[in-house]
A protein has these predicted regions:
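Bacterial N-terminal signal peptides that target proteins for export
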Residues: 2-21
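N-terminal signal peptide c-region/cleavage motif recognized by signal peptidases
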Residues: 29-32
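Soluble non-cytosolic domains of exported or imported proteins
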Residues: 81-85, 100, 155, 159-163, ...
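Conserved C-terminal helix/tail region of periplasmic/extracytoplasmic solute-binding proteins
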Residues: 319-346
Length: 346
């Protein structure tokens, strides 16, 4: 009796210890998952350069990969913004966890935050040409612009288009003359610039934009192309990227990997389903463009949707040389988080 009683007490005590240990482990596991954010907010610019984010939003790909990673029900929210400066402000103010814009705005933020927020890119989004279009028949090259002209870019001196214009100006006017046309630039979102250029009734006589807006502009017989960014770069190069802070990645490792997986899946979806991707873009953007028109752009061989960087150092070499960047990366990996380092980037 006594033996059985003692054994019962011991078994009960041991059971409680084991149960408590298991409960503690479960709490730790649950706590680890709960420690990561339950809402992931994306601030992005406008246009087909960010098509993966449109697709991820519509197909709930971030939510899918977060759940597969054991994070439970995570919500992804997407906010379109008209300029890269607004996108970067959203990230730094804590209004967004991820920012998506052109490569040069990312590089400038990387340069400025190396000893603070330590912003780096998680992935690129696509490689696509950007066109400088004009409604002035007599403008055949950059040398034909006058002081009366105004060139619309998303953000002066900061946006992808503004930096490419500087690179083109140096090629046109000689080394050191990269800022020769800066005084002609004005900040306008792509939709606003397109409306202004097509109307012909504003000071804007040229628009440096991106797909689909540049092709929409060229539908008018009064508009023609002056330069193509690929000609300036000497070939294709990444146009846009997705970035965040080192702190967010450190505190949310599973979420970060889920976002990258979502972008990879969205890239594959676009390649395999361009028609559906075009329909998603039109619906989410409330665009009046024809689905066939957008699909034709998406399937243009010049445009590639990929999370792997392409010719990133062409931007950094120029921007460091002219003083826009104080720090010049030796490799593209310095600009990206380790999740991307084993890919065949450039």
């Amino acid at each position: 009796m006594a033996k059985n009683g003692t054994g019962g007490m011991g078994g009960s005590f041991l059971g409680k210890v084991l149960a408590g240990g298991v409960a503690s482990v479960l709490c730790l596991i649950a706590g680890s998952a709960a420690a990561e954010v339950q809402t992931v907010r994306f601030a992005r610019q406008l246009g087909l350069g960010y098509l993966q984010l449109y697709v991820a939003q519509d197909l709930k790909l971030v939510e899918k990969h977060a759940k597969e990673a054991g994070l439970g029900d995570v919500t992804a929210a997407y906010t379109p913004l008209g300029s890269p400066s607004a996108v970067n402000d959203a990230l730094l103010s804590g209004s967004a966890e991820f920012a998506a814009a052109g490569i040069p705005p990312f590089l400038i933020l990387w340069d400025k935050t190396r000893k603070s927020a330590d912003v780096r890119a998680l992935a690129t989004l696509n490689s696509q040409p950007a066109y400088l279009n004009t409604n002035k028949p007599d403008v055949k090259s950059l040398a034909d612009f006058t002081e009366k002209d105004r060139i619309a870019v998303p953000t002066v001196k900061l946006s992808y288009q503004a930096i490419i214009l500087q690179m083109a100006a140096e090629k046109q006017f000689g080394e050191g003359n990269y800022a020769k046309l800066d005084n002609l630039t004005v900040s306008l979102s792509h939709p606003e610039a397109t409306i202004s250029l097509l109307s012909g009734k504003t000071e804007v006589s040229a628009s440096f934009t991106s797909p689909p807006f540049q092709y929409q502009q060229l539908e008018s017989d009064k508009v023609h192309r002056v330069i193509n960014s690929y000609d300036v770069l000497g070939g294709p190069g990444s146009f846009s990227a997705l970035w965040t802070t080192a702190k967010f990645r450190e505190n949310n490792p599973k979420t970060t990997k889920a976002v990258l997986a979502a972008m990879d899946e969205a890239s594959a979806f676009i390649k395999e389903n361009p028609k559906q991707a075009a329909e998603i873009y039109i619906r989410l953007d409330n665009s009046k463009l024809a689905p066939e028109f957008v699909e034709k752009i998406i399937t243009d061989p010049e445009i590639q949707y990929s999370t792997t960087p392409q010719n990133i150092l062409k931007y950094t070499d120029f921007m460091a040389r002219v003083g826009t960047l104080k720090n010049k990366p030796a490799t593209w990996q310095e600009l990206f988080f380790p999740e991307l380092h084993d890919r065949a980037g450039s």
